[in-house]
Amino acid sequence: MAFLDFLRPKPAVKPLSFSEPIFIKENSSTKNQIEKLEKWKELIIPEQADRLTKDIKKLTSGLNGEKTVAYELKNSYLPILILQDLYLKNQDTTAQIDFVVIATSFILVIESKKLIDDIEVTNKGDFNRCFKTATGLVYKKEGMYNPVTQNQRHVDLLKRLLSEQMPALPVQDWDTLLQSVVVLANPKTVIQDANAPAEIRDKIIKHDQLINHLKKLQEANTGVLLSEQDMRAIADILVSAHQERPYTPPANYQFTVPLCPKCNVPMVRRTAKKGAKQGNEFFGCPNYPKCRQIINID
């Protein structure tokens, strides 16, 4: 069957006008989250300062992982369109997607993971984080959510969204085009997946394997090819569907200033510059002028 697939000619597609990667959307909400947490250092109660520092460190690690994946994509020298950090909603389902890569023969949804510990995947597909001593002995295993399953949910949402916006393309073609992969961005992470189901094992790669993974997908004879017009139309649909999300403090954070009743973020002390209350101090929302919530200071 594979030999017959190899012999089957691919549909003819007009040559693309570009030959290297193009970032259609290149930014990360993680960077904005870190910047906000840095600003909140002076606003949080002293007892939670260490927790805030740990949260910043965790987000910074994730951001570095995204940068690693972005670097690999930029240096793939493949004619692909790339969208980074999409927040999509469809049928009351939401998805925070790290990267979507659009090529003529595939649409790849990438989940980036910067994991510090080694990972074990069992024969049932369960994921465990392995904690080691300084000598390398595993002293504890802790279950974690399955990133492959999570990413598949992102693919399912993407399929619904795109099939609604581009009904001319049959549903089975979306099933063929849409692919998913989890990229481990920490070169020191060891993944023990020898006993993992093939459908799980094949969806996890190291960041230095990403370019070869893209090439394999590009060369695969799926019988479905997108034109450049299709590729750019898909990118436009996803950019239009993307929703910006205001970052709110993690649960149980306590601040020395009130939170905005509308945005749930620490408010900023300000002084009225005009009007009957000129000179009076008040707390205003940092999202002004989008949000005009205030709390007067007696």
Named regions from a protein language model:
Residues 1-95, 106, 132-298:
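Surface-exposed interaction regions that form or flank ligand-binding interfaces
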Residues 98:
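Cell-envelope/extracellular polymer assembly enzymes that use nucleotide-activated donors
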Residues 101-132:
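Active-site beta-strand-loop-beta-strand hairpin of nuclease catalytic cores
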